[in-house]
């Protein structure tokens, strides 16, 4: 959902690939956002990432976490009336948005796409797009060792 929100903020029509409500037919290209894969590994020794000072509570908090990689599906669809060039324009805009700033908390490692194809049955142009992003899934522990919060952050932001 956050990736779809980020793309919308960048001027790219985006929806979750598996929405809670029925889909509406679009008149322009749209990105269907899904998570295709997620994997994690150690982020530090015994998952310990260090400490940070909390200004609000004026205490030190320990951070524990793991490095994670997400493969997002960002498939593009466009009605027949838009043509294949609308898919290319939407992909270019998406690539620029992901390269320049990227989704909050994530660092894009790789962006790939397939060819634009026309689905006769659906009457839509389609291009498969995938973005590999890295970040950290971390938890904040209080002095007693209880975890207070879980947060996903980009690799360069810890």
Residue ranges of predicted features:
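C-terminal tail/extension regions appended to the core domain(s) of diverse proteins
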Residues: 4, 8, 124-158
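Oligomerization/assembly interface segments of phage tail-like spikes and tubes
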Residues: 62-81, 125-137
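Acidic, Ser/Thr- and Gly-enriched intrinsically disordered low-complexity segments
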Residues: 42-44, 69-103
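C-terminal basic regulatory modules in eukaryotic proteins
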Residues: 52-72, 86, 155-158
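Residue-level signal for secondary-structure boundary sites
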Residues: 41, 82, 137-141
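Short structured motifs
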Residues: 17-19, 57-59, 111-117
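Acidic-leaning, charged glycine-interspersed low-complexity segments
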Residues: 87-142
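Small/polar-rich, solvent-exposed N-terminal microdomains that initiate assembly or binding
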Residues: 1-55, 156-158
């Amino acid at each position: 959902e956050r990736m779809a929100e980020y793309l919308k903020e960048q001027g790219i029509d985006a929806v979750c690939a598996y929405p809670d409500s029925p889909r509406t037919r679009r008149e322009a290209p749209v990105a269907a956002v899904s998570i295709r894969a997620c994997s994690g590994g150690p982020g530090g020794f015994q998952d310990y990432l260090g400490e940070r000072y909390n200004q609000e509570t004026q205490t030190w908090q320990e951070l524990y976490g793991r490095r994670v990689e997400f493969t997002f599906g960002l498939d593009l669809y466009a009605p027949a009336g838009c043509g294949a060039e609308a898919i290319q324009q939407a992909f270019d805009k998406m690539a620029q948005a992901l390269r320049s700033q990227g989704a909050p908390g994530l660092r894009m490692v790789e962006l790939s796409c397939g060819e634009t194809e026309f689905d006769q049955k659906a009457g839509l142009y389609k291009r498969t797009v995938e973005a590999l992003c890295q970040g950290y899934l971390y938890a904040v522990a209080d002095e007693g060792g209880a975890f207070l919060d879980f947060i996903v952050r980009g690799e360069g932001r810890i």
